[in-house]
Amino acid sequence: MKTNLLRRLLALLLAMVSLFALPVLAEEGEDWEDEDISLEDVETEGDAEDEEIIVSDSEDASIEGLTPLYTTKIKAFVKTGKGINMRLRQDLESDVVTFVKTGEVITIYKVYPSFVLCEYNGYVGYIVRTWIDENMTVLDPENTPPYGVVPSQYVATLTQTSDVHVSPSLDSDVMKIHPAAGCKIAILEFVDGFAKVLYWRSYGYIDASLLTDLVVVSPTLDPEDHDMPIAAFCSFFEYNTGKEGNEGRCKNIAHSADRMSKIMYPGEQMDLNNDVGPWKKANGYYPAPVLINGGSQLGYGGGTCQSSSTLYNTVRQIPGITIVYRKPHGPGCAKYLPMHQDAAVGSSTLNFIFRNDCEFPIRIQAESTGEGTLCIQIFRVYEE
C-alpha cells in the first residue's frame, strides 16, 4: 500500500514538473513580471525599454471635432503605482496635463499605436496604452469598431527591399526592419506618395513607387469583386540578424502561415495549438527563442506567437468571427504590435481559438517570404 502511494505521488510530482516546463512560444523580452516600483518610474523608463515609441504626429492634444469612442479605467501593473500622467503630446517627455489615479475612468477619442487621445475631468491629453484596461465600453457599437481593431484599405507587394520611414518623407529616419522584395504589406492609407503601415507600436511609411499588385480591401462583407479581401493585416519582423535562432524564427513564421491558410466553413473552429501546431520538429518547425520557466532558450516553433497575433488582428476585423479563447503575453503584451493586440500560443494556457460564425465560408490567405513581413488576408468564399 505504501509503495503504491509513493509511486502515485512520484508520478504526480513528475507530471507537475513537466507541466510547468512547457515552452511559451514568445521570443525573449515579450513577457515579464511586475516590478515593485512606482508607476512614474515605469512611464519614463520601462516603456522605453519595452517599446520604441516613434511618433510623427506631435501636435498638442485636442478633441475638437472628434466623437467619443470608448470609456475605460486606468490600470496599474505595479504594486506601488497610484496613477499615470496625462501628456500634452505623444511624447513621454512632453508637458504633464494632469495626473490620473488608478481606477479612474477616461473617455477615449482616438487610438494610436502607442497612445490614446482621451479626456478626464475636463482635461484632454495622451496616455500610453500600457496603462489602460483593454476591457472597455464601446459608446456606439453600431458605428465604432472594437478597441484595437485596425482595418486596412489596401494590400500591395514590394518590388525591392524597402526602407520604412518614420514620416512620409525620404529624408526622414528609417526603422530597423527593411522588408525584402516580394513581401506583402497591408496599407492603412496613402499619405503624400507613401503607404502608411502599422509598424510595431508606431506608424511607418513606405515609398509608394516601390509597390505593385495593389488590391483594395472591401469595406463591406459583400465585396464587389470576389477577389477582394474583406480583411487584411500585416506585421513586421527582423530577419538576417545573425542572432541565434533568428533564421529559425523567420522560417517558423513562414511555415505557420502556410499551415493556417485554409477555408473555414460556418461553425468551423480553428485552434492554433492543435491546427497550426503542435509546435514540433515533426510538423516542420525549427528551433528559435522561446520562453521556458521565465527564461529564454531555443525551442521548436519559436516566433509563431507573431503568426497567431497577426491572425488575431485580421479576424477581429470581421464581425461574424467569434474569439473563443485568447491570452496576451502577460501585462506588457508583445512588442511587435500595439498594446493589447497580441495572442500568445504554445502552452496549455496560452492559445488562440476562434470560430467562423459568418453565414458564409471564409478563406484565410497568410503569406510570408520570411524576410520582414507576415501579411494575412481573409476572403469571402462564394460557393457555386
PLM features: what roles do these ranges have?
Residues 2-10:
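Bacterial N-terminal signal peptides that target proteins for export
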Residues 14-19:
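Hydrophobic core
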Residues 20-33:
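Sec-dependent signal peptide cleavage junction
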Residues 30-85, 99-102, 110-112, 134-163, ...:
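SH3-family beta-barrel domains
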Residues 85-89, 165-168:
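Short, cationic motifs built from Arg/Lys/His that form the positively charged side of catalytic pockets
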Residues 98-130, 179, 183-209:
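SH3/SH3-like beta-barrel superfamily modules
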Residues 129-137, 208-217:
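Structured surface patches comprising rigid loops and adjacent beta-strands/short helices at the edges
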Residues 143-159, 166-184, 188-192, 200-201, ...:
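Well-ordered beta-sheet/strand-loop patches within structured domains
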